[in-house]
């Protein structure tokens, strides 16, 4: 389950307490009698984030509280999360990262696009294509939007079939 081809999983957070907790908890996950089947989980310093083959962006600034009046949660998330992903994309550029930059945080597609665009701007904000290549940036959605659209289509199909 990864232990044979993944040497370790690195985690990083702005809080040392969070990373210590994650490292402790994740290293307790194992299969009975196959304790080395899963890769070790290690804390990685921010300056070492891109010394890897795959960087997975799963950070989030959060979601608006219920009743806040925010109509489009995805755009609220994008406004906040795009600033975070841009920072890491610029770091990937600076460090000449050659691996996969995977985006899992919502909204996946706009954040993946932001990562690619921001990595390809110089220090003056000029777009120069000297950052991540398009094929290096991949969005990995959790299927939530697809499922929501599927439910909506099913509901509409049911309504139209009732006539």
Language-model features and meaning:
Residues 8, 12-52:
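Conserved N-terminal Rossmann-fold NAD(P) cofactor-binding segment
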Residues 108-132:
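Short, electropositive alpha-helical surface patch
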Residues 2-8:
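Conserved S-adenosyl-L-methionine
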Residues 32-42, 124-136:
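Short mixed-charge
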